[in-house]
Curated annotation (Swiss-Prot):
Protein name: Glutamyl-tRNA(Gln) amidotransferase subunit A
Active site: 78 (charge relay system), 153 (charge relay system), 177 (acyl-ester intermediate)
Known role: Allows the formation of correctly charged Gln-tRNA(Gln) through the transamidation of misacylated Glu-tRNA(Gln) in organisms which lack glutaminyl-tRNA synthetase. The reaction takes place in the presence of glutamine and ATP through an activated gamma-phospho-Glu-tRNA(Gln).
Record keywords: ATP-binding, Ligase, Nucleotide-binding, Protein biosynthesis
Record's keyword annotation contains Hydrolase: no
Reactions accelerated catalytically: L-glutamyl-tRNA(Gln) + L-glutamine + ATP + H2O = L-glutaminyl-tRNA(Gln) + L-glutamate + ADP + phosphate + H(+)
HAMAP family associated with the record: GatA
Domain of life, source organism: Bacteria
Provenance organism: Desulfosudis oleivorans (strain DSM 6200 / JCM 39069 / Hxd3)
Family recorded in the similarity comment: Belongs to the amidase family. GatA subfamily.
Binding partners and assembly: Heterotrimer of A, B and C subunits.
Amino acid sequence: MEPYALTIHEARQLLDKKEISSVELTRSVFDRIERVEPKVGAYITLARESALSAAAAADTRLQSGGIAPLTGIPLAVKDLICTTGLRTTCASRMLETFMPPYDATVIEKLKTQGAVITGKVNMDEFAMGSSTEHSALGSTKNPWNLACIPGGSSGGSAASVAADMCLGSLGSDTGGSIRQPASHCGVVGIKPTYGRVSRYGLVAFASSLDQIGVLAKDVTDSALLLSAISGHDPSDSTSVPREVPDYAASCEKGLSGLTIGVCREYINAEGLDPEVADTVNRSIEHMKAQGAACVEVSLPHAQYAVAAYYVIAPAEASSNLARYDGVKYGFRDPEADSLLEMYARTRSRGFGKEVQRRIIIGTYCLSSGYYDAYYRKASQVRSLIADDFKKAFETCDVIVSPVAPTPAFELGAKTEDPLTMYLSDIFTLSANLAGVPGMSVPGGFSSTGLPIGVQLIAGHFNEPALVRCAWNLEQAVNIANKKPAL
């Protein structure tokens, strides 16, 4: 096996035994990037020189015995997480040359462990999209079928992991942006509980929904990554001071004593692809065969999640993105003759169509006379959705559902139909609105060879139950070693 194809835990064993060095591992990853990146287009910025320097430092650390789980491991980072010395573009013309003056807390945590950052990966502009086609710096393709989308907005994160162009990646999830691309690219993705991972240094889209998470080749790797980036951060007022468990310790526990909930509103949803439904139902049977109990649960207000989300998220985005006006940093239109013209031209030329659309929607929802009719009502629906989850978790530990209604669709199929694109996240939005953790784990493949993920959702801070359930499902399905033919 080539070093770039290793999982994190496999690489960890070889590094600890001195059977491979971090420099050798990192060079292997960059050789792989050189071969397949022109096909996939996962990266915005490569950091070969600094990565090899970090790998050499990791090797020195390995010799001295100061080893952490991620020491010497090459990882990619979604390009809306701030990195000192490495531009952070948000896949937007507005920030195309922006160099952050500080590292995000999660980046500090990775560097403290001695991880190697390979570069910044592509995304939908400012994380607004479900296909990674809304990037000002080029679209990313699905490694399993280069004519298809990888999902979004963390499409570069998922594609880089699936294509073995890193051993793991950081992403962010505002309405499904980790779980949906993880499903489409056949990798594991975790959106943690809101407040579990610091958002300091994450460029904001919708602050009450955004959450940094991880994408990995298998469940064990995802657990290792999540443990590494979790924990309280005084720099983030929404960060929760709660002890971080060893998530990987949940991997080899059986499912006896665990209860899974089947939400019929999701399983019987209109527009659900039959192959996706079959994959979810088979996964439920796998978990029952391994000792899990199964009950039906109801999320009666889930049908309103899309409507509520597309009021709340654009409203918060319109506020967060007001800071990009061409004055302090970022793109500035050089042809404006007045301050007001500079604002208008900068924002109309610096933001793409989808970002402009959501800013306009959000501004309208917050405008005088419409706040109560839209934003307040959406916030009330959000509370009802959170209550639905609370009631469901009184009878089960983990809810099993689809991640997306269909496998990955073709590039360009939905770019001119925003409403159809928005419905791609119909099964993932509710977890963000409720602030609960969600996870996508590979469950099988479509008849055309495209990956299909299964979503697992747990109560607040019950990520160990997600990992436990996902690991057992992974063992039963036994497709973690299947790779795209690039």
